[in-house]
Structures are given as C-alpha cells and as structure tokens.
C-alpha cells in the first residue's frame, strides 16, 4: 500500500496579477471541477487585479457555502493561460517529477475529497476551506511511473467519452437535418402537402405530468440508488425508485433557463427507468407522431411568447400544449420514423457507453485510496 503524504509538501500558492492586461481569457470554475467561460459582467471592472493562471496550475474556491456537497477546484489543461477572480486561490505542484498535476486532480475528483473539504470548512456566515486545510490533505503519492500509468488509464477513458460525445452531437445534428429536410425545407405552411395539417402539441403528445412527483433532499437521502432523478434541466440526484420506464421527452416547466438565448425550450430526451420532479413536463408521442419527432420539432420552436412570470419564468401546460406544429401524413411519419429510429439507436448506444465508462472512471478514482 502506498504511503500517504501531506499535500502541502508538494504544492505552493501562486499570486500573479494581470498587471499588463495581456491575458484576456476570463474563466470561472464549476462544482463539476471544470473551467468555463465567465458570465460575470466585467464592464468597468479593473481586470489588472485578476489572477493569472498558467497551464498545469490549479485553482480552487475556498468559499464552500451554497455549493452543495462539492468543492469547486480545477486544473487548467485546455488553455495556455487565463485569468480568474481575485477570490480564487491559484496554486501549483512544485516538482512534476514527484507529483503529477493530473494525478492530483484525479484525487480532487474523488467524492471522498469533497466530503473531507466540506467537513473541514469553517465559518458561520460563510464556510471556508482555507489554504492551510488544503495543505493538510493527506494523499497516496506512488512513484512517478505509477502516477503516469494511473493518469494514462483515466485519460484513455476520458478521451473515449469525448469521442462518444462528438458522435452524439453528430447523430443529433443528422436527425435534426433529416427533420428539416422532411418537414421544414421547401414546405409552404399555407399550402401543405396532401394529408398534412397544422395542429397543436396537445393533439399529438401525451402529457404525463400527473405521474411526476417532487421529492425534497431529505426525502431522497434514505432512498439513494441507481435511477436518475430529473429536474428542469438535468439529473439532480439518483434514487432507488422510478416512476417512468420507456422513451420520453422532458420539456422544462420553470426556472431561469426555461428557454435558451434563441427562445427554444429546454428539452431532455430520455429513455430507461427514472423519476421526474415537478419542474419539467413529461411528454410522449401518441399514435400520430413519435417522441423523436416531438424532440426534433420542438427544438425548432420559439417559445418566448409562452413564458410567464418575471421572478420565476414558467411555461405552463396550457401554453405548452398550444404550440403549433406541422402534423404530416401517416406515410411520411412512418418513413421519417424508420430513418430517425436508426439514428437514435446509435445515439442511445453511445450515451449508454459513456455511462459505463463514467462508472469505470469512478472505480479508478476509488482505487487510488486503496
């Protein structure tokens, strides 16, 4: 078993400011431990006080309040440099022949590290995981050769996920192009082909909102499991029970991102067993159209006029059901389904493979502590 070492013996804090304003790439940091373009309003802000981060340096946010069970920490590996908020702590590994930054970042991805950081955060108004606490973290530091092997295994899995994500995006774009070619391009809504008509979403979709059920965090804690628990935009949790089993489309009901910057509704195409709370409408195609058709058609819709509420934007069921869509003939729909179902079969295979690979990554992270 590898001996545990004190992290502070391998890292040092870095505090370089953007005095010459040469670095303009402003990044934020998420609890998913990834850097992302900052959405902060920087008009009139003195960017010379921001901290500079170089490739292979790490950044963390000491304030762990309001971030759930995770700590925001990341390794800059996709950019040569960037700038971050003055509130962030920048640090680096002092000797890459003793500890690889990539290996260290793998340790930070472990849920055990998040629990450790939350437990060792202090403060009343704000909970802080300070620099001294970070330095006191104990971790196994195997030989540099073994570290490289572990990192290589993890990055092989990460690269496979990346390739699958590219394939998923390509398949979805292909399905959307097929939809547009069949039902949008060169189609005159005032003079539709024989057997086609304009109808409403409520006519062609089965809404299953009556089956959904919200569960509070306290209600979910004793029933943790493998089934996804979905909210308006994504998976919120995993529990040991499910309501739905099959292929469905979730249509975001409320929240700040109920529509995107182009006015399109927030959608989630799902299959398998899962639970949904009351922040997303649950739809399926009926005997007229397929669920895949609904997905492609609704991605084209501008739903801006359907949103109500200022403090809490919302698209209620009545407004959603009023969306007007082209309803093609059965022959055209059958032909479309034959082609699009093949596309989505590959889409599902790639997505499910990513889930399995993610499980392998979790196992690899777990083995680091053994």
Annotate each language-model stretch with its function.
Residues 76-77, 123-124, 189, 217-219, ...:
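Short, solvent-exposed loop/turn elements at beta->coil junctions and helix N-caps
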Residues 49-51, 57-58, 296, 340-347:
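His/acidic/aromatic-lined binding-pocket segments of jelly-roll/cupin-type domains
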Residues 55, 59-109, 231-233, 242-299, ...:
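A short beta-sheet element
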